[in-house]
Design a protein with these regions (language model features):
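Non-catalytic interaction-recognition regions
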Residues: 2-104, 111, 115, 119-580
């Protein structure tokens, strides 16, 4: 149950009932219909909830809003509600003050729902796919992949918490130009091992990393000179297969170490082998969106996007300024482009597997591809504008002691995900990378391993561990956490106690926001706020040494905080240690 929404609903119900009572008594005009807002004011000194009902209704009633508000307060019955008082404020606001029943029901809700606390059914019945990381399998994963991994995995969890049926997928680009380049790079290093470094020229556009040398060495170690004198295609196919068979399991292992598991690894090559790329291009042709030029087959991307922009209200002049261009789908040599395969892949997501919504997590450098891919789905009649969403994330800068870090101290090479996980705890990596996707972030390697309140993940985990220690100590003294229905919540009158329960109650709203905005960093900010609220409560309110009823009420509040901290930490893929 969302206790904040429950309180808002009750404010509306109380206000509506008071209006109907006043209208029946002839105190207010009948038949007035309004849709007022109910909000939590920034300053809760005068009330916990406020409504604009009187301001919205006064115009239709042709009365002063304060006069309407005064009548409603006199007609309002707060018996057996969450509220203890309602007051007129400002130009006609009604301010409601929460009572102990709401605070008690909030704690009871956490107890009853357990791990499901914070869940909502907004997306129930919807089938979502989140595709993320999808790193090039020709080399190690980098910091962009590290950030995208956390963002995609946590977003998927948030969507699940909002009721969606979520599928996590990694798209393996095991076909096309980059695999050809991968094979040529491995071939050069393989031959250099046998013929000598100077005897074989390395391709100028090849992959120059040491990982290519190592793969070639391993291939030579396994196969010897077996492939040296065979035809180039056979050698390239063998080298590419060997390299991918080595790299992909390593990627899976690193991502599993990072706490990420996929429902499927979808291989691009299967789209080509099954003929689905050709079939998708044919479907675009049948719909009149392709043409031939210079021996190649082109997608009329500019026309598709122009049609969409006109529907959105753009003028021909504005569209002309954009310089829209068309895209090659099939080259003159008969090979399909990466874009053609990408169109086929996304068509498969919608037309074959039936996802209601597809979310891709991409680096911001792919922003130019967003409209093109959405447009291609529109051209296929798959409503890419509304069913395909792209989350673009900005770059990551690694920093140590205020200086940008580009190379691993251990390897002397660009820092990979493996290097990062060797140095930084997984919890810190996941917490730090779960930042707002649209902001460029600095990952402070020094801060990530600090064990003090400056480290945000440590700060939150310490709050959880602190509560666990408290519970253990009190248990040793004979005090166990009571059930909510055995607690007198009217004893929790300190402002820090009530502020903490309000934070606990807001968790469901935060999950809703994170799902709506495709921004799971809402959960991080919530965790920091909840931990801060607990530390304030713990500093202000003694637990040990209090009278038993107060002790048990505060003990229950502490344990409820622990449960919600663990719930939210689990949601973002971090642990909640019981001692630190």
């Amino acid at each position: 149950m969302n206790m904040i929404q429950s309180a808002k609903d009750q404010v509306l119900a109380l206000t509506t009932a008071a209006y109907q009572k006043a209208a029946a008594a002839g105190l207010l005009p009948e038949g007035v219909t309004v849709t007022p807002s109910v909000e939590i004011p920034k300053d809760t000194a005068n009330g916990d909830y406020t409504t604009t009902f009187c301001l919205a209704a006064a115009k239709a009633m042709r009365m002063n809003p304060r006069q309407v508000a005064q009548i409603l307060t006199e007609q309002m019955d707060l018996t057996d509600t969450y509220f203890t008082s309602v007051e007129l404020a400002g130009p006609g606001f009604l301010n409601f003050r929460l009572g102990s029943r709401w605070f008690g029901d909030t704690v009871a809700c956490v107890e009853a729902e357990g791990a499901d606390y914070g869940r909502n059914d907004t997306l129930t019945g919807k089938k979502y796919m989140v595709e993320f990381v999808s790193a090039n399998p020709t080399g190690p994963m980098h910091m962009g992949n590290a950030r995208g991994g956390v963002l995609g995995d946590t977003l998927a969890s948030v969507l699940q918490k909002s009721g969606a049926d979520v599928w996590r997928e990694f798209y393996v680009n095991d076909a096309g130009n980059q695999i050809d380049k991968f094979a040529r790079s491995l071939d050069a290093r393989y031959q250099q091992l046998i013929r000598g470094e100077d005897a074989v020229e390395f391709p100028e556009d090849g992959y120059h990393g040491d990982d290519i040398r190592e793969l070639a060495r391993l291939f030579y170690q396994q196969e010897g000179e077996k492939y040296l004198d065979c035809d180039e295609k056979t050698r390239h196919d063998a080298l590419a297969k060997f390299g991918l068979d080595h790299n992909i399991p390593k990627m899976k292992a690193d991502l599993a170490r990072y706490g990420i598991q996929y429902d499927a690894w979808f291989f691009e090559s299967t789209l080509h082998e099954s003929g689905y790329v050709a079939d998708s291009v044919k479907a675009l042709t049948q719909r009149g969106y392709t043409y031939e030029k210079d021996g190649a087959l082109w997608l009329a991307t500019s026309r598709i996007l122009a049609e969409n922009l006109k529907k959105a209200g753009k003028s021909d002049e504005d569209i002309e300024k954009l310089g829209l261009k068309d895209d090659v789908l099939r080259r003159a040599n008969g090979f399909y482009t990466y874009f053609a395969a990408d169109i086929a892949y996304h068509r498969n997501k919608f037309a074959v597997r039936g996802f209601d919504k597809v979310i891709n997590v991409w680096g911001a450098d792919h922003h130019g591809h967003v409209a093109r891919l959405k447009g291609a789905m529109d051209a296929l009649g798959l409503d890419g504008e509304h069913r395909l969403d792209i989350v673009l994330m900005q770059l990551v800068k690694l920093v140590r002691d205020g200086e940008m870090v580009r190379m691993s101290k251990r390897t002397g090479k660009a820092i990979s995900l493996t290097d990062l996980l060797d140095e930084i705890p997984v919890d810190a990596c996941r917490y730090f990378f779960n930042a707002k996707p649209e902001t460029q972030m600095e990952f402070d390697l020094g801060l990530a391993v600090r064990e003090d309140s400056e480290n945000p993940v440590y700060y939150v985990q310490y709050a959880h561990a602190r509560i666990c220690t408290l519970l253990k100590n009190l248990e040793a003294e004979g005090y166990t956490v009571p059930a909510a229905d055995a607690v007198d919540f009217s004893l929790l009158t300190d402002e820090t106690e009530q502020a903490l329960i309000k934070q606990i109650a807001s968790y469901g709203q935060v999950v809703l926001l994170a799902a709506r905005d495709y921004d799971p960093s809402h959960i991080n900010r919530y965790l920091t706020a909840l931990a801060a609220a607990f530390h304030k409560f713990y500093a202000a309110c003694r637990i040990k040494g209090e009278e038993k009823p107060v002790l048990l009420a505060r003990l229950k509040l502490a344990d409820t905080t622990r449960a919600v901290l663990k719930n939210a930490m689990t949601l973002i893929g971090c642990s909640a240690p019981e001692k630190m």
